[in-house]
Amino acid sequence: MAAQVEDDVANLKLDDSTTKPTNGTSQPDSKLSAEAEDSDDDAEGDGNGTGEAGADGAAKKKKKRKPRKKKKAGTSATAGAKSQTSPPRVLISDLFPNDSYPEGEICEYRDENSYRTTNEEKRHLDRMNNDFLTDYRKGAEIHRQVRQWAANWIKPGMTLTEIAEGIEDSVRALTGHQGLEEGDAQKAGMGFPTGLSINHCAAHYTPNAGNKVVVNYEDVMKVDFGVHINGRIVDSAFTKTFDPVYDPLVEACKAATNAGIKEAGIDVRMSDIGAAIQEVMESYEVEIGGKMLPVKCIRNLNGHSIGHYTIHGGKTVPIVKGSDQTKMEEGETFAIETFGSTGKGYVRDDMETSHYALRPDAPKVALRISSAKSLLASITKNFGTLPFCRRYLDRLGHDKYLLGLNNLVSSGIVEAYPPLCDIKGSWTAQSEHTFVLRPTCKEVLSRGDDY
């Protein structure tokens, strides 16, 4: 989910000394071991004697083997033998019964932080902080399985509502939390609404009720959704296209995001990360309609830190060179997301708002509209500070709530996040990953075989 800030000016170079770590996997790591069976030669060897005794002995051996095979078949129904369905509906905890979820991509720290990899004190701190990592890795595994299914499932002619609900239903099924009972959505589920922003719209668009928009073959659609487990949010996004003409635009964002992740680390300045991202992104160009177009960073869209139950933390990660001297710190979680555009490289609020969130620092205001009071109580109980959309309110059975919702926004209690768009006729793309700065290494939680 995008963060929007003002751009600064400074120029720093990308350090290419990072070594590429091993990717995490998105498959269950428990496998059934093969059981050796007695060979026919052994059976014949045991029955060398003649007469009924030898025949009875052979028969008994066969009878003994059958129960063993049946028992093994029974154990094959354990969680390790299960696989995900299409669409995804198998609880992720059934695929990983011991809560042993795959690590993300492990990146060793560089330069003055390289000592952290083997430092005993840092290793001890790493071992002490495993509980929250389990929640993050569980959310990341759900994100991988859902997005990989969605990327193959999405086709031209589908409505945005169909796509959004397909992704969200899958996330809820894998977490085991449908979010219909009071407080259930705060235990696990959607970290924020599914963003499906098309072409010049870069971020924060999800269909409201009655939306009939259909995705077409020539569209460039950003698919941005989050999964949370106990408030630990994994935020990751990819760009879905059908026409290969847009491949260079998509690749520019992927490469720029990877450059930002490579540069990021403990005590690294935000300005350095922004410079690294911009250098890579703007080295690309794309030919559309016979015109060669440069790919520009959308300079007022940024990555961000992620807090507990808070998708946009207190820090932003620029995607252009600037003068921000803020540093990343040990233990922080960040989403690095990059946006490339063939337009102005600058977005503005446009179209109908769908995304909202209760402000963590919301003022205590006397609400005079009764519908606003009841709506605020429902938002607080069901979402807390997690972002939500109008469809989520519809799903909970709310009716005629717009007056109350607008009152909460105007009172400063709820923040509205309107769609962010470049100029019409332009194309925009996005790539995003979430990582955590562990004491000994940088773990890219959302990394998968797909991106």
UniProtKB/Swiss-Prot annotation:
Residue stretches of biased makeup (Polar residues): 19-28
Keyword line: Aminopeptidase, Cytoplasm, Hydrolase, Metal-binding, Protease
Biased composition (Acidic residues): 35-45
CDD domains associated with the record: MetAP2
Annotated localization: Cytoplasm
Single GO cellular component term: cytoplasm
Annotated binding of substrate, by residue: 204, 312
The reaction(s) this protein catalyses: Release of N-terminal amino acids, preferentially methionine, from peptides and arylamides
Entry similarity comment: Belongs to the peptidase M24A family. Methionine aminopeptidase eukaryotic type 2 subfamily.
HAMAP family: MetAP_2_euk
Record protein name field: Methionine aminopeptidase 2-2
The organism of origin for this protein: Leptosphaeria maculans (strain JN3 / isolate v23.1.3 / race Av1-4-5-6-7-8) (Blackleg fungus)
Organism lineage string: Eukaryota, Fungi, Dikarya, Ascomycota, Pezizomycotina
